[in-house]
């Protein structure tokens, strides 16, 4: 086991508050294995097991990178979204930090159509704005912002992820269910109120504390970055536009769906909705 992948200590985890679980009345009995004790009405997580689980999981994370498969970070609750987005960008991986849209993994055709719509709107706003009225521009800008907010982190995802990393699988149960349906392994930060059964790599910890989430997600991100550096793999931001070669390949796949219409006709139906 490559313990060098993780330089954290039990003390680091404790200082981040990773040991604080939920109130005893809100626990999931299946998390009993990872609980150290009950104190003042709260369950205290066994941080030795947290560290063990993290060190056990990191080589599997690195294996996904070595297999040239993408990783998807998921964390849409307030405490997680900024951490998830920053870590994914720094690692050159993908993320969902806003609303999880049903079918993001299991119905990629629909998601790709939404991304194509986003691309078309951007093109019209940047290249064809002179043909649009102020009202049309305002409506398109509003729609663009909504689509970008939800799709930004997976916009250039072209392959099925080799791993999904989740903060709070109870909160992200749809994402977990879609990953399991496709046979994608799931690594999750799991608190004492969650069911760890569907999770392949359980990291027991306080998943409501910003410090706890940041500490553990940063350790995972660092392992990804260091593995890529050792392999000589370029770290490219997931929100960066595709290269010309990648764009050409993508265009070839989607060419049959491209059809130049009058701008008014393009968006009449969508705006009516």
From Swiss-Prot:
Domain of life: Bacteria
Protein name (Swiss-Prot/TrEMBL): Small ribosomal subunit protein uS2
Cellular component terms per the entry's GO annotation: cytosolic small ribosomal subunit
Ranges of compositional bias, category Basic and acidic residues: 255-273
InterPro entries, A to Z: Ribosomal_uS2 (IPR001865), Ribosomal_uS2_bac/mit/plastid (IPR005706), Ribosomal_uS2_CS (IPR018130), Ribosomal_uS2_flav_dom_sf (IPR023591)
A GO molecular-function annotation: structural constituent of ribosome
Protein encoded by which gene: rpsB
Family of this protein: Belongs to the universal ribosomal protein uS2 family.
Chain residue ranges for the region called Disordered: 244-273
UniProt keyword annotations, A-Z: Ribonucleoprotein, Ribosomal protein
SUPFAM superfamilies registered for this protein in UniProt: Ribosomal protein S2 (SSF52313)
PANTHER family linked: 30S RIBOSOMAL PROTEIN S2 PROKARYOTIC AND ORGANELLAR, SMALL RIBOSOMAL SUBUNIT PROTEIN US2M
GO biological process: one example: translation
Pfam family, one: Ribosomal_S2
